[in-house]
């Protein structure tokens, strides 16, 4: 879709900000092999944006670390990322995160290309 191309830089920014918060909140308990995929970006009539993103990890243990006890760490990651996105985009942001386990995701050539990381 046409709107998907125009918001591509913002979609990448959203993924990078969420990824940064994962590293800050997990204190390097989760390897840097974690990635974030912005799944949807929806402009709202009130000027806000709704972003849905997947945090992708390689193992169940990493998923548990990212989610935290009772979802507390995932909530903290989302709150901090949302606040930073609102500052960067200068508008209200509704951010929804979920965690996926995708074994060996980092070896998937198509996904690497989609993230702008061409494998050697």
Question: Where do the language-model regions lie?
Answer:
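C-terminal-of-GTPase-core extension/linker across diverse P-loop GTPases
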Residues: 1-120
């Amino acid at each position: 879709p046409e709107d998907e191309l125009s918001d591509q830089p913002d979609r990448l920014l959203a993924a990078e900000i969420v990824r940064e918060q994962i590293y800050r909140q997990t204190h390097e308990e989760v390897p840097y092999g974690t990635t974030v995929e912005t799944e949807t970006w929806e402009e709202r009539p009130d000027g806000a944006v709704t972003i849905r993103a997947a945090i992708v990890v390689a193992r169940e243990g990493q998923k548990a670390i990212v989610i935290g006890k009772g979802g507390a760490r995932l909530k903290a990651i989302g709150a901090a990322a949302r606040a930073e996105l609102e500052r960067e985009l200068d508008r209200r942001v509704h951010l929804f995160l979920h965690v996926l386990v995708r074994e060996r995701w980092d070896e998937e050539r198509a996904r690497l290309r989609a993230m702008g990381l061409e494998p050697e």
